[in-house]
Amino acid sequence: MEISTPLDCAPALVGPLPRRNSRAAQIRWGDRVVHVGGDAPVCVQSMTNTDTSDAIGTAIQVKELARAGSELVRITVDTPAAAAAVPAIREQLDRMGVDVPLVGDFHYNGHKLLQDYPECAQALSKYRINPGNVGQGAKRDTQFAQMIEIACRYDKPVRIGVNWGSLDQDLLARIMDENAQRATPWDARAVMVEALITSAIQSAQKAEELGLPGSQIILSCKVSAVQDLIAVYRELARRCHYALHLGLTEAGMGSKGIVASTAALSVLLQEGIGDTIRISLTPEPGAPREKEVIVAQEILQTMGLRNFTPMVIACPGCGRTTSTVFQELAARIQSYLREQMPVWKEQYPGVEEMNVAVMGCIVNGPGESKHANIGISLPGTGESPAAPVFVDGVKVKTLRGERITEEFQAIVDEYVRTHYGAQTPATV
């Protein structure tokens, strides 16, 4: 068997491709400006699942999503009661000091709601329009134009969001007819991809003709199959320069939804495609809505595209780690770091880049701990009941006894205070 010899040059290191050149949009509320596209970092957004007519309940959930790190929050605006509640939601948020921009999600009757409730139109920072259900036949163009004209009047960006489950049926029928005339017809998936892209780009071009600047337009073409989403966005990115919103629609619940969204979005983000993302998870009954924000952040952070919170490195456990102490410590530290971030990110710039290692035995524990900013190697089965702690690669102490968790957390706090700022962090 032939064994290859080492190369004279260093191995090639893989990183994301340069970001696609897209137009930069600005979503504003008060002094808060969220940049989407251009050279801005990929933005994280989310969506409420409250009844929007419940202004207090919706404002509370928006606050929770924003506190988790959502930079834009979308709310459903589907009824007169919902439209009437939007200004009250915005007012409640402003009173609470939450300046996250709100995006209004419109289907079927958006033209009428925006026209009849101008205070709603002004309180929103961005509109989402679905060209597949904005109207049928001649009404479609008229009602689409009404929404774009209101966006122009109030200087609001628009996301033209096409979804495979609500495609413009007239457009789809035309593309299917054209396909039937081909010498070698495309398969059904290719036709669907073409219909999605055509709907998005033609709608964007129409919006520009109506006076909406191209820098105020964001596009999305959502499907529920991973490979189809990748194909759609690769082609959409090739054909236009609008900012792109990425998301796998109806991703599902639990680990399936997380895996599917991660599989699709990671490929596109690695190729430099995507300016803002949303993870469409179906929450477990009673589960916090903020989970979709955390997953979006973790995708971007693990890919090295953005940093949101200190990263906890922990081993998976094996027969050497029959104790659950390291698992409990890793979970507690991860939770603690995330809880502190709303305060720490203001007081200690750069803390989001910190790495913390919580390891379960002597095999990889000391090595991983030395490579982290702070690391602890807990004893495995049969090992000495001692946990060495490393700070910036240097062993600083060994913890023993029943208060290892509290003592290690205190070391983390001290590191943050001394390396990222001079003030003592407030508790959240």
UniProtKB/Swiss-Prot annotation:
- What would be one Pfam family of this protein? GcpE
Name of the top EC class for this enzyme = oxidoreductase
Could you say which EC number(s) this protein's record lists?
1.17.7.3
Per its Swiss-Prot or TrEMBL entry, what cofactor is needed? [4Fe-4S] cluster
Reactions accelerated catalytically = (2E)-4-hydroxy-3-methylbut-2-enyl diphosphate + oxidized [flavodoxin] + H2O + 2 H(+) = 2-C-methyl-D-erythritol 2,4-cyclic diphosphate + reduced [flavodoxin]
Write out the GO MF terms.
Answer: 4 iron, 4 sulfur cluster binding; 4-hydroxy-3-methylbut-2-en-1-yl diphosphate synthase activity (ferredoxin); 4-hydroxy-3-methylbut-2-enyl-diphosphate synthase activity (flavodoxin); iron ion binding
* Pathway(s) this gene product operates in, as recorded in its UniProt entry: Isoprenoid biosynthesis; isopentenyl diphosphate biosynthesis via DXP pathway; isopentenyl diphosphate from 1-deoxy-D-xylulose 5-phosphate: step 5/6
Q: Which residues bind [4Fe-4S] cluster?
A: C315, C318, C361, E368
Manganese in keyword set = no
For this UniProt record, give its keywords in alphabetical order, as a comma-separated list. 4Fe-4S, Iron, Iron-sulfur, Isoprene biosynthesis, Metal-binding, Oxidoreductase
Can the keyword Ribonucleoprotein be found in this entry's annotation? Answer: no
Q: Name one GO biological process term.
A: isopentenyl diphosphate biosynthetic process, methylerythritol 4-phosphate pathway
Entry's transmembrane regions: none
Entry note: cofactor: Binds 1 [4Fe-4S] cluster.
Describe its function.
Converts 2C-methyl-D-erythritol 2,4-cyclodiphosphate (ME-2,4cPP) into 1-hydroxy-2-methyl-2-(E)-butenyl 4-diphosphate.
Q: Which family does it belong to?
A: Belongs to the IspG family.
Q: What is this protein called?
A: 4-hydroxy-3-methylbut-2-en-1-yl diphosphate synthase (flavodoxin)
